[in-house]
Amino acid sequence: MKPIYGLIGNPVAHSMSPDIHNAALKDLSLEGHYHAFRVENEDLEDAVKGMRALGIQGFNVTVPHKVSIMKHLDRIDESAEALGAVNTVRREKEGLVGYNTDGAGFLKSLKPSLDRPLSELSILLIGAGGAARAIFTTLAAETPKRLDVANRTPEKALAFTQRFDGEARALSLQEAEADLSAYDIVIQTTSVGMHPNVEAAPLSLANAKETCLVCDIIYNPLKTALLHEAEAKGLKTLDGVGMFIGQAALAFELWTGHEPNMEKMKSIVLQQLGGKSC
């Protein structure tokens, strides 16, 4: 049987993971097929059992399962354990093993947009889910000047900031919005603004300073409501395409042992979205 790869999450109808992974398999003349599976929270355990039964070689994990998937796996890679979330699963001799390529993928996309080292910058991270965990831990290793986390429930954000040795605060979204002028970088990691709820934004950028870089890890739509507001204010922006491609390429290599052509992956995404990346 040809190898099967996949994606589990909810929603997944918008995902371009099947497009880029299937194109990469074809480009490298590798057998296999990648398919997206919509999985509700209450069905996650059964879905993982199904992955085992079907002999699926590897799969990506997206919202809302990046944290809850961990208890259903046979082993968690050390880096994913430290990040507290899994976005990639590979079938190995010992069973299903969880990895995380989110943090490395995001950092790879962020650095070309910076004119100073992260150690000189104050950062606001919006959200406290699986992707936020990965990005927070990766950024913390870069020792930024300040690394605050804002979330609808500040208690969840507090669990992040307590792990950082430097200056960090856990904030409500309202508190972050009021103090937005303190940040050089704002990073939006939640599903707010994702297709089909494209008019939504987690907070207003009214108080952001002129030099602020606004990042949104969502890539569909290419420009979220938050990024549209940032552009209208003349702020620099970074969409989620770079992170999406970066983490996908790392996952693909984990499964197949082959490095995909990232430029081809990016061109597929931009063609599907009908625009140019920020």
Curated annotation (Swiss-Prot):
One of its GO terms (molecular function) is shikimate 3-dehydrogenase (NADP+) activity. NADP(+) binds at residues 78, 127-131, 151-156, 217, 240. It catalyses: shikimate + NADP(+) = 3-dehydroshikimate + NADPH + H(+). Shikimate binds at residues 15-17, 62, 87, 102, 219. Pfam families: SDH_C, Shikimate_DH, Shikimate_dh_N. Pathway: Metabolic intermediate biosynthesis; chorismate biosynthesis; chorismate from D-erythrose 4-phosphate and phosphoenolpyruvate: step 4/7. The keyword Oxidoreductase applies. One of its GO terms (cellular component) is cytosol. It is an enzyme of class 1 (oxidoreductase). Keywords: Amino-acid biosynthesis, Aromatic amino acid biosynthesis, NADP, Oxidoreductase. Involved in the biosynthesis of the chorismate, which leads to the biosynthesis of aromatic amino acids. Catalyzes the reversible NADPH linked reduction of 3-dehydroshikimate (DHSA) to yield shikimate (SA). HAMAP family: Shikimate_DH_AroE. Belongs to the shikimate dehydrogenase family. Homodimer. This is Shikimate dehydrogenase (NADP(+)).
